[in-house]
Curated annotation (Swiss-Prot):
This is UDP-N-acetylglucosamine--N-acetylmuramyl-(pentapeptide) pyrophosphoryl-undecaprenol N-acetylglucosamine transferase. It is found in: Cell inner membrane. It catalyses: di-trans,octa-cis-undecaprenyl diphospho-N-acetyl-alpha-D-muramoyl-L-alanyl-D-glutamyl-meso-2,6-diaminopimeloyl-D-alanyl-D-alanine + UDP-N-acetyl-alpha-D-glucosamine = di-trans,octa-cis-undecaprenyl diphospho-[N-acetyl-alpha-D-glucosaminyl-(1->4)]-N-acetyl-alpha-D-muramoyl-L-alanyl-D-glutamyl-meso-2,6-diaminopimeloyl-D-alanyl-D-alanine + UDP + H(+). Its EC number is 2.4.1.227.
Length: 365
């Protein structure tokens, strides 16, 4: 069931988290600029319902939720709900008539991928994390092409390593700047996601105070929604408010990365790829409750390259953070080398690579 018009069409399935949605948006924008018609498949309850229309793309919704870790009755009902969702996705495909379907993670990808296969439409999968999610793991057996961001992601499935699509502004930043080796205050960017990271919020005021006794340090700390007053108060209580910027959320990550010497953060796939692209050293604390502990394997990409330190949250304390920051503040040459080594593993043309695979399959069809 191919599109008989000259205009090529792609149905993109991605949702749930920014780690799925933002890379998919990068591909959507790239193909749209090449005169492709782009449509989205997602769920009405997750972030794609808001973000995708904001970026100018039409979105269709199906009814589907995750089943991992839920109760017995829900698991028993899951096959029937999946069947219903597959039929919903198939109706979207029959109406839109895409030349290719791209799955980039999230609940909608499962039913949408099955519907694509049943409809005879080429299915491309892209896995952002170093350990594949359950949906992509299952769909990889029926996909026309499997893509991944990191080496050795899939077992016994031939997958092409293409990197993670990221915003072109960050790629440009990495190409236009070098790691700052000037012996001035160590600039530490602390990012814990939109909700913040409690462990960072609890530790960093005291860590900053301790490091400031031996080295010059400034901090830009994203604390997450609802945490601004308490964390700012902790810095003020220690007399550190003059050298710290505290924000609930950082809207301009390009400016934040450009400012920073080192980043303290989680190890989401998109974060790891962005750090590599901009060439920033990092201290990575993987989210300990991530499914299959995939953030630890994401982090290893930068750690093994020598571009990051890994501090599992189970052993994280103030002394370890103080030690790492003091090392970096004392040895700016090593800081620069870490940034260079991080940049060595960057794949800056991931958007084009994903799009090119979709274009190739659409032309074959």
């Amino acid at each position: 069931m191919t599109n008989i018009s000259a205009e090529k069409r792609i149905l993109i399935m991605a949702g749930g988290t920014g780690g799925h949605v933002f890379p998919a948006l990068a591909v959507a924008k790239y193909l749209s600029q090449k005169s492709w018609k782009v449509r989205w498949l997602g769920t009405a309850e997750r972030m794609e319902a808001r973000l995708v229309p904001q970026h100018g793309f039409d979105i269709d919704f199906i009814d589907i939720k995750g089943v991992r870790g839920n109760g017995l009755l829900r698991k028993l009902a899951a096959p029937f709900k999946v069947m219903r969702s597959v039929m919903q996705a198939r109706r979207v495909i029959q109406e839109f008539k895409p030349d290719v379907v791209l799955g980039m993670g999230g609940f909608a990808s499962g039913p949408g991928g099955i519907a694509a296969r049943l409809s005879g439409i080429p299915l491309v999968l892209h896995e952002q994390n170093a350990i594949p999610g359950m949906t992509n793991k299952l769909l990889s057996r029926i996909a026309s092409k499997v893509l991944c961001a990191f080496e050795d992601t899939f077992d016994n499935i031939p997958a092409q390593v293409v990197g993670n699509p990221i915003r072109k502004e960050l790629i440009a930043l990495g190409q236009s700047t070098e790691t700052d080796c000037v012996e001035d205050a160590l600039k530490v960017l602390v990012v814990g996601g939109s909700l913040g990271a409690k462990v960072f919020n609890d530790l960093m005021p005291g860590v900053t105070d301790a490091v400031s006794k031996t080295h010059s340090i400034t901090v830009w700390h994203q604390v997450g929604k609802g945490n601004l007053a308490s964390v700012k108060g902790d810095y003020q209580h220690l007399g550190q408010d003059g050298s710290v910027i505290v924000a609930e959320f950082i809207d301009d990550m390009e400016a934040a990365y450009s400012w920073a010497d080192v980043v303290l953060c989680r190890a989401g796939a998109l974060t790891v790829s962005e750090l590599a692209a901009v060439g920033l050293p990092s201290i990575l604390v993987p989210y300990p409750h991530a499914v299959d502990d995939h953030q630890t394997k994401n982090a290893q990409v930068l750690v093994n390259a020598g571009g990051a330190f890994l501090l599992p949250q189970t052993i994280l304390d103030a002394d370890k953070l103080i030690s790492k920051l003091q090392i970096l503040a004392s040895d700016r040459a090593e800081l620069c080398h870490m940034g260079e080594r991080a940049k060595d593993v960057a794949i800056i043309d991931a958007t084009e690579k994903v799009a090119d695979v979709c274009i190739e399959l659409a032309q074959k069809d």
